[in-house]
């Protein structure tokens, strides 16, 4: 569901922010030393491990996003506009972790033991810049997903209101008391609350 994907994306964005701070610290250490010691290399290994974990988790979220898109494409109630937005999100997901970033990670891992300090410093700076871009793209994805969710919720709410209106119409025409006035009022109150909540979320996205 969108909620699940949004929650995971928020987690990954927070992880990336922390990783960028760790890389900043590492860069400061590298600038203050002429040579790297064993501790520096261990720190570097840990940073690379964290980076890999984030990338692997991201790829899992990407799979979930594809499944969500397939579900929406096969659902006849999904509007053309929502489908277009979903496709836009999917394209952004595919762009997030570029091949150059993966290659840079591999190179860093291979050369960790023998890389000169200056070269490592440059590569860490590149990694930091890539992570900044990655974070910005994740933020864009989050904004689009949240917007998509609000629009879907609103469409579902309109369907529920139409359904309730139809039931009331039938009740009046047929004198059918299967849906009492009290029931109708309660359902309408619930839908009004849902609408208020959706409009509040929408206001927060603008």
Can you annotate each of these PLM segments?
Residues 1-206:
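Feature detects intrinsically disordered, low-complexity acidic/polar segments
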